[in-house]
Amino acid sequence: MEQDLSYQLAFGTYEDALRMVGATSEPRTAATAVSAARIQLFAAMVHDGNRSYWDAEYARQRWGGLLAPPALLMGWLIPPPWQPTQQGSVRPVAGLLLRVPLPGTTFINAANDVEFLEPIVEGDLLTVVEELVSVSPEKRTRLGVGHFVQTLETYRRQDGTVVARNRNTLFRFTPAAAP
């Protein structure tokens, strides 16, 4: 049975979107803790021999445990596609970006800036809250007409410590007609 991963996209006006600025998502907690197996699988796939990913004793002394590669930050929060406790298919929660009411049916990521404040190590259980930071007035680009939407994701580990912040800017637009 295939799971429907489609989301309902919110439509509205720029003024509707401005009223959402400052809104935050419900906290979303990873299904599993950061694990050595996933750290090392990722490092193996990208051929990264950083000792902090492979040498448990070295990593424990330097970071408090095997260090999670920075590129895995958002990956820890991706839910498994199926769990034995599920009854039928469960629709994943749509991200805050999809719920911002704006015109436009197409997205492109314009910028992403991640700040790591504390090491993320094996055993950490991450929770993220997303906040709508800003929506630009309408912009005309070669891609089409739309709005830049900026969000801030704040990642915390199980003790409440903020470990990372991810500022993302996305351009939501209506594609320009082909020449």
PLM region descriptions:
Residues 1-27, 109-179:
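HotDog/MaoC-like acyl-thioester-processing domains
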Residues 2-111, 177-179:
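Hot-dog-fold acyl-thioester-processing enzymes
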